[in-house]
Amino acid sequence: MIRSLRAGVALAAVLSLTAPGFALAIGLPHLPSLPKIGHSSAPAAFQMLPPGVWPQAQSDVPADPDVRFGALPNGMRYAIKRQAVPAGQAAIRLRFDAGSLMESDAQQGLAHFLEHMAFNGSKNVPEGEMVKILERHGLAFGADTNASTNFDETVYKLDLPKTDDDTVDTSLKLMRETASELTIGKEAVDRERGVVLSEERASDSPAYRVFKQRLGFLLPGQRMPQRLPIGHVDVLQKAPPSLIADFYHHYYRPERATLVVVGDFDPAAMEAKIRAKFADWRAVGPAGPEPDLGRVEPRKTEAKLLVEPAAALSLQVTWVRPPDLAQDRLAKRRSDIVEQLAFAVLNRRFSALARSAQPPFLGAVAFKADQGHSAEVTMLNLVAQPDGWRTALAAVDQEERRAVRYGVRQDELDREIAEVRASSQAAVAGAATRRPAQIADEIVGSLGDQEVVTAPAEDLAIFESAVKGLKADTVSAALKAAFSGQGPLVFMSSPKPVQGAEPAILAEYASTQKVAVAPPTAPHQVAWPYESFGTPGKVAETKEITDLDTVFVRFDNGVRLTVKPTKFRDDEVLVRVNIGDGLQDLPKDRQSLAWFGNAFIEGGLKQIDNEDTERVLASKVYGARFAVGEDAFVLSGSTRTADLPTEMQVLTAYVSDPGWRSEAFKRQQSAGRTLHDQMEGTDGGVIQRELSGLLHAGDRRFTFPSRDDIAKAQLADLQAQVEPHLANDPIEVVIVGDITVDKAIDAVSRTFGALPARRAAQPVPASQRLVSFPAANAQPLMLTHKGRADQAIGYVAWPTNDLWANPQQALDNDVLGEVMDLRLIDELREAQGVTYSPSVSYSHSLTWTGWGYLAASVEVPPAKLDGFFRDVSKIANDLRTKDVTADELERAKKPRIDKLEKSRVTNQYWLAELSGAQADPRRLDFIRHIIPGTERVTAADVKRAAQLFLKDDKAYKLAVEPQGRKAAD
């Protein structure tokens, strides 16, 4: 369902080196990425719909006719939609109008705690059994079985790999248990405290602390800043089960519940199952009160500075108004679209500034957003270098005032309309093959704002009615009206103190507002210059791989094309271009500049820059990404069927005529200057930075760039490493999706097939394919972070082997990893309650000779690290010496097999698996073998794999602790 336009067209590309990314850097983890837009209104309480009523009953917006909406006599609503593609899959969501805003002072954090208790015992399902029951039906914990708590809702999620009666009935039974039958026993609550506290530790990042402070600054005295979903540590540590049970009975009630089921089933039969399972549900005790969210108070221009050493420099200028509580109506949606187009134009201007030769900031966006029905805000957001905030603030303020004073131009508006129309048309074309989880999440996402669930075709129709005859003056007026309200309020987070603090920020803002702004200049005319690459190439050879519905093609210039037509997603076509040998072509002893890959795309093409490319191709759906893979330099993109020729033109132009503009490289380099400071702020950031280099024994192709590497990097070095391979190495094109073989051949023949012949593929020297694994250590390698004193990570890895050494052994190792994951969860999360997210990962390389691993990791307080290493060693020993049970084997294998089967009906799976298959037919054999090979793994195979690889004297251990812990101890 279309709700808003993209904010900041190239922002992700500009800021790819920021950590943890722009949204988190400005402290917006809880704001929607595509904010809902509306008009301000007088303060009022958010009115819930009467029990059992859907929004369309009070709206003129047509509801999706393919969704069966209903309600039970007890007030519980349900929405059912048949989605037959992919076959045999379904998604179930149970949403409660119950979040942290409903908590009392003594219950802060208990809405989320209750979500955890849903997996810890009910009247008919013993503690610890719910997840195991689902695993036996192929649902993996975390991936297919999950839940989330927000300010105003709690949602339970099941993604079903099968829709047989047993799986569906079991899933509905467990949802019913969650709704009304939880036991919330004392022992279970006490065990779960450590898990919830672990989640609190893990979530307390620099970006989250920025978010908390900013929310409190924007909404002082209101309930939302006082009811963050994670809650208060003292409540989590001490709250009795009775307080959790009180919240449960007050807010988990039929009239506050909505069940959404989407998938491959008969809707009438599903409706009967829902009625049979939920009709007798009755609420217990009195209903809980609706929270008083508070009022937006009158305020003048104010500023607040937060010094957060591990955060990026971010600044927001915000106007705050009472929330928009108007009903969802066609007129409102049309006005929202007009307003969103206005913001899209402004954000496009910010993008152009960020791409300029002397960019005043790293990135900036503007939007309006609802804040939990507590307020509506208009925000100007920017990220800049710490010493450049004044220049950045001036640029954002002046560009906003320029847009408000002089308005938007018709050509700017028409461009945004064309882009939204193209993406909306693609959404309509692909509607029949959306995934059940996507549709279910969209329906759930509409409930909090009481919006009508609409079909993509209706969204497009509303959009077209809104933009028909739309003039720039109307959009300009909407933009001007959006910048109103209390304030503006200026919030800055900085990694270091700012001289003069808040008074200096206010003075700078006042100063820039005195600067007169001139009208914007109209852009120059431009045309797409890469429609022809010469005489189309001729097909030299064609080979059909009939059992995989795949065709191999070789052109006379040596370019290879692999095509797999599918109907997994209507109107979706994925393209990947593999050139040369990637990391294998780079030196082992010098820092690779592959991490500057975004600068390659942002650098544009010789005949047209990236900004103009986006403008001239606004009506097309295309993509361009660049990466240095282990076995190829990779260009990739996604498109719709009609735009495949354009997609191929774009990718061919990047290979044959890249622009290598220095501005893009410098922006990337500038963003990287504070990257180490940001990553050192959490244990997760440190391990993210260090792990790849450590697991490859210091091979510079895999190490993260040092501060010095970033500072001294030169565009010429990147160009020297990459350009010769792009210009001369063999090319393989893989196309998967809603396309015919003939159309794929035609598009490639006119682009890559028309290029001059490339040199023949050469074997990679054995020394370049050899990567070492780190030597075992008796004591963990200790790394430090600068975050909270109670945050630490433990990590253990054992070397295994590459895939081709023994493909069946690799699958045995995968199942071994799944069994170890089950045992880590049982021991560290369920039995000890010391961590939220123990995990096991494994890899068997298709590229590096002899390289593979199986690893276990955990986030715990530092004092628990030794216990983790002991527990992992014991689990490894048990796996070496004792047989796994039949139940464990089933719970390990079935979710993995079901995951593989689900993956095989996606275009992404085949794009990855078919890459390189023409040069290495073993990849085809492994595609055929992976599911039957996993099915045949036995308990004896798992034990043998553990004996081969889980040896104490081979284990490589790593720990990330808070800086200064040993000195403090």
Language-model-detected regions and their locations in the chain:
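Bacterial N-terminal signal peptides that target proteins for export
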Residues: 1-10
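Non-catalytic, conformational "gating/processing" segments within enzyme and secreted inhibitor domains
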Residues: 181, 186, 193-194, 244-275, ...
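Hydrophobic, small-residue-rich alpha-helical packing segments that form membrane-like cores
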Residues: 188, 193-202, 206-255, 260-274, ...
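Proteolytic maturation boundary segments
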Residues: 25-80, 266-339, 343-351, 355, ...
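C-terminal segment of classical bacterial N-terminal signal peptides
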Residues: 15-24
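Alpha-helical scaffold elements lining the catalytic groove of polysaccharide deacetylases
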Residues: 236-240, 244, 710-713, 718, ...
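M16 family metallopeptidases and their MPP-like homologs
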Residues: 79, 86-105, 109-111, 128-177, ...
